[in-house]
């Protein structure tokens, strides 16, 4: 009988990976719990603003703060000129150094929209956003806005759909 010299090595690695997956997946699943903290309508983006509070965007246009300890939820007013249609609405939100950045589908008039990004100083009652980016040209569509935000080394990164 001829045995490939790599056969034993392949079997050894296969068994090692198999046992790792079998035993580690069980231990991961035992420590994972899922709790519904708030009744939200189409939540899209979220970011911790403290150890206890999470700010959340709802695609339908609301921004809410949820206290994950007390489970208290309250809505924050804002001045965004958003457009809810298809995949459009309020999208991602990110917090850093007492500022918020949000991506959203902006109503540019005459059924034209764009993916836009705005910035505001954190205020838990009323957010006064100022646009820092508007995709050009605005188009007549309710689809493919994207969008996720990330901050790295004081740079704001944003993804968008193929608009």
Predicted feature locations:
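Acidic, Gly/Ser/Thr-rich repeat motifs that build Ca2+-stabilized beta-propeller blades
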Residues: 28-163
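Cleavable N-terminal signal peptides
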Residues: 16-17, 27-28
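N-terminal secretory signal peptides that target proteins for export/translocation
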Residues: 1-11
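A generic signature of intrinsically disordered, low-complexity regions enriched in glycine/proline
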Residues: 8-10, 17, 71, 96
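Hydrophobic alpha-helical segments and their boundary regions
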Residues: 13-14, 78
């Amino acid at each position: 009988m001829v045995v490939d010299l790599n056969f034993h090595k392949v079997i050894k690695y296969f068994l090692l990976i198999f046992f790792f997956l079998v035993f580690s997946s069980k231990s991961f699943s035992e420590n994972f719990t899922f709790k519904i903290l708030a009744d939200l309508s189409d939540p899209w983006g979220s970011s911790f603003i403290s150890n206890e509070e999470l700010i959340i965007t709802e695609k339908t246009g609301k921004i809410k703060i949820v206290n994950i300890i007390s489970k208290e939820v309250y809505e924050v007013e804002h001045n965004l000129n958003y457009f809810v249609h298809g995949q459009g609405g309020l999208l991602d939100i990110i917090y850093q150094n007492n500022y918020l950045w949000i991506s959203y589908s902006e109503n540019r008039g005459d059924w034209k929209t764009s993916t836009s990004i705005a910035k505001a100083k954190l205020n838990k009652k009323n957010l006064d956003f100022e646009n820092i980016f508007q995709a050009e040209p605005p188009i007549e569509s309710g689809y493919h806005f994207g969008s996720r935000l990330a901050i790295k080394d004081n740079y704001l990164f944003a993804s968008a759909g193929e608009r």
